């Protein structure tokens, strides 16, 4: 099952969503997508509906 993880890049304030298996760690998700772990925080997990309605980029 995939979950929608909402992240925020701390330097720019940009928010984005990564879809990943529910057993994946935040570090695994960000490393796979090529984001710098030092500058990204996980905010929350969104439902499919919330992710769709957010208008944010989904990786």
What are the language-model segments listed below?
Residues 1-14:
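Short aromatic-glycine-(Arg/Gly/Cys) micro-motifs in beta-strand/loop hairpins
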Residues 31-59:
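Short, mixed-charge low-complexity intrinsically disordered segments
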């Amino acid at each position: 099952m995939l979950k929608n993880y909402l992240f925020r890049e701390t330097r720019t304030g940009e928010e984005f969503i990564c879809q990943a298996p529910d057993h994946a760690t935040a570090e695994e998700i960000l490393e796979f997508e090529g984001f710098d772990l030092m500058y990204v925080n996980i905010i929350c997990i969104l439902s499919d509906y919330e992710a769709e309605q957010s208008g944010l980029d989904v990786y």
